[in-house]
Amino acid sequence: MSVIKMTDLDLAGKRVFIRADLNVPVKDGKVTSDARIRASLPTIELALKQGAKVMVTSHLGRPTEGEYNEEFSLLPVVNYLKDKLSNPVRLVKDYLDGVDVAEGELVVLENVRFNKGEKKDDETLSKKYAALCDVFVMDAFGTAHRAQASTHGIGKFADVACAGPLLAAELDALGKALKEPARPMVAIVGGSKVSTKLTVLDSLSKIADQLIVGGGIANTFIAAQGHDVGKSLYEADLVDEAKRLLTTCNIPVPSDVRVATEFSETAPATLKSVNDVKADEQILDIGDASAQELAEILKNAKTILWNGPVGVFEFPNFRKGTEIVANAIADSEAFSIAGGGDTLAAIDLFGIADKISYISTGGGAFLEFVEGKVLPAVAMLEERAKK
């Protein structure tokens, strides 16, 4: 993947526009989870250190486009950045007709979704963004799969368009896991529905030596093997699709499971063979033998791609399967990459973040990259690198 990298450029004295992913949860005017801002800080600090005139922006939430709404302001992000940086930081609300930035100062441009035409990748808006800078830095992998004015359009018109360190690292890590993985390559796809992950399963079945399925997805595969899944979440209309995948790829389907008669945090768990699931029971986790089998597979892997838990890990009684799998990934010597909201929550819960080789910041973008789709922002950066 050939793109210009921000780290290859001299930014001294240049007006630098960084499109970061600062879309963080905010409650009562305070940032409640700072992971995305923390991930973006090194990029901002590097540009400031080089003596650039730095502007950074992002979307936050889903405001009505073209209207200012205090609820979706980047002000809480600005206050957070003021605490973390020694440089002056200020928020600018009206910037489309130009903004003055001093060297060593960080200007946060208000929520891009307050600008009409942002989501539609409007050309006039894109040109206005581009006129603000000498160098455009795309560093928001989480929105790279959307062609919008601040992620894609601006890059077509800016003098220079490059990938920020976060985006570059993300592309390198995903490339390493998917393009020429060290083998055996094991992929884990969890989640509730086969339908939402079908393309991912399809793509990975062609790359992975073993494809581990978990959650509601695994239930559809258990049904495909002719077992009764009781009241479990599964998709009857995709059983044939699961059967097809079972013939094209090595998919270890659970042999034992944990079940309950209701979907609740306090429901007691019963461990049993997949042959014995009753009509009034639902599968909420994989069993111990299945979890150990997966741990063994992961122990021998050289590359692991992890997207989704293998059970309802939010409920303590149905956490064990995901915990065993998570710890097996953490203990493995494989190159491991993890992505997706539930996966990140599991990594936090089991405290293994420092044992995963690379944690992806993108949800939808991560999945689309895995599916082999072209990410518009990345395609634009590749195009600009040729000029």
Swiss-Prot record:
GO cellular component: cytosol
Disulfide-linked positions: none
Catalytic activity, EC: 2.7.2.3
InterPro entries reported in the protein's UniProt record: Phosphoglycerate_kinase (IPR001576), Phosphoglycerate_kinase_CS (IPR015911), Phosphoglycerate_kinase_N (IPR015824), Phosphoglycerate_kinase_sf (IPR036043)
Gene Ontology MF term list: ADP binding; ATP binding; guanosine tetraphosphate binding; phosphoglycerate kinase activity
Keywords recorded for this protein, A-Z: Acetylation, ATP-binding, Cytoplasm, Glycolysis, Kinase, Nucleotide-binding, Transferase
Residue sites binding ATP per the record: 197, 314, 340-343
Entry-linked Pfam families: PGK (PF00162)
PROSITE patterns in the cross-refs: PGLYCERATE_KINASE
Pathway: Carbohydrate degradation; glycolysis; pyruvate from D-glyceraldehyde 3-phosphate: step 2/5
Catalysed reactions listed for this entry: (2R)-3-phosphoglycerate + ATP = (2R)-3-phospho-glyceroyl phosphate + ADP
Subcellular location(s) per record: Cytoplasm
Residue numbers bearing the N6-acetyllysine modification: 84
Membrane-spanning segments: none
Biological-process GO terms, alphabetical: gluconeogenesis; glycolytic process
Protein family per UniProt: Belongs to the phosphoglycerate kinase family.
Subunit structure: Monomer.
Name listed for the protein in its UniProt record: Phosphoglycerate kinase
Species per Swiss-Prot/TrEMBL record: Escherichia coli (strain K12)
